[in-house]
Amino acid sequence: PHVLDGVARARVFPYDTTTDGGKPVQASATLYEPTAPWRGKGERPTIIFAPGTRGAGDQCAPSHAGMGLGSVGLSKVGSPTINANYEYGFYMGAVQHGARVIVADLIGLGMPGHHTYVNHIEEAHAMLDAARSGLELAHAPQDSPIGFAGYSQGGGASLAAAEFADSYAPRIERSRNLLRRPAG
């Protein structure tokens, strides 16, 4: 894991999820675990975040932005790419206040496969499965309080996760939903 500004350990992890047709696929996410102990009531809260669209190539995945403000690189065909992690301030603000943050790449970004842009069922599955896997990786109870958040495409993904939580992931204890300008 990487230590970010002394306030969090971050690591990218793969997890299993399903397409809207029920086909198993792998996706990736980043877990930001605060280094300070939780001082609030109950279990440490977790925010499952889906970023806005940065592009459709694997190099555009949030987990490929590096563990900071972004990255510069080359695409598979050799053209230059910039992956700006413009939500980094949100992640660090949440972590500094003691929340765990899991940033979902969504299906087809950062892993083999085609990015299924704004497919609300697959976005919901990806966010809910990122929550389950991230909580397990953090050794946190599956019923820890979580909230969904996102911006642009991620705002729509967070709404979809809230909509499908009871039927797709009933063990997840959803406590809040926060979105910023869903795509539409």
Place the predicted regions along the sequence by residue.
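Solvent-exposed loop/turn segments at secondary-structure junctions
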Residues: 20-21, 52-57, 107-111, 153-156, ...
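Alpha/beta-hydrolase active-site loop
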Residues: 89, 96, 117-138
